[in-house]
Amino acid sequence: MKKLYPILFIVIINFSFAQTKQFIYDYIYVPDSTQKNVTESEIMVLNINKEKSEYFTYDRYFSDSTMLSGSKKGLFMMPPNKKMSSDRVNKTSNSNQIKFITQLGFTKYFVDENIDLKWKLYPEYITVLNYKAHKATTEFGGRKWTAWFAKDIPFQDGPYKFKGLPGLIVKIEDESKSHKFELKGIKNTNYDFEYPNLNNYSKINLDYPKFIKAYKNYRKDPAADLVGRYMDQTDSSGNFRRGVDIFREEQKREEEKIQKDNNIIEINLIK
């Protein structure tokens, strides 16, 4: 069952650069290739202004904003106990350079990438949110993709790292139907957007080849950042627990989680 989110979906006709345009996408994906009938979904946001665009998960943004607001008031707040993507993508207008931001363990990676997608255009079209959307295909991240872009929405941008078509990408899906983004709403915002910076993590700046190595190392040992973080303690029932035993339990959980997360959007990272 799809989740409902407290976002007002409004279609705006005026696409001048007077304001930041906010495009809301539904992202549906299959996390485990051995269970193709099990899907998960997230609401993704793409903010576009004259100079740049920023893409992120709505739930993560809401959580980070709430935690930042609490910290300014001296309150310690924990993020909700739910699965949320940490992926963010910042693109610069008229450039192939992007900044991909993601978190692995307790480390946040700021990855510099050069994205130059090769698109093939077709005469077919469909309608998405009353916009005529034309067909295009490309290959990216080890997958073949079919996209639909609207020339009447004059932004050469799209969800995640997708870009470079003569109109906004309003729908895109990979050949295996494991990952699909579809535009669900458009609205104007009257403020300069800035993603909340919590500063509660280690930060590493690197290029994409070095990130590939870091990502592969993380999947081999997803609990590496947890080493030394658990002290001996007494639980709520009064039972003594060694820190090393707690760590091993967490290590097992992280390894099981990684095994089930085997159908990532950039599948080439694990092949």
Which residue ranges define each predicted feature?
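Short secondary-structure boundary segments
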Residues: F9-V11, P123-F140, W145-W148, D152-P154
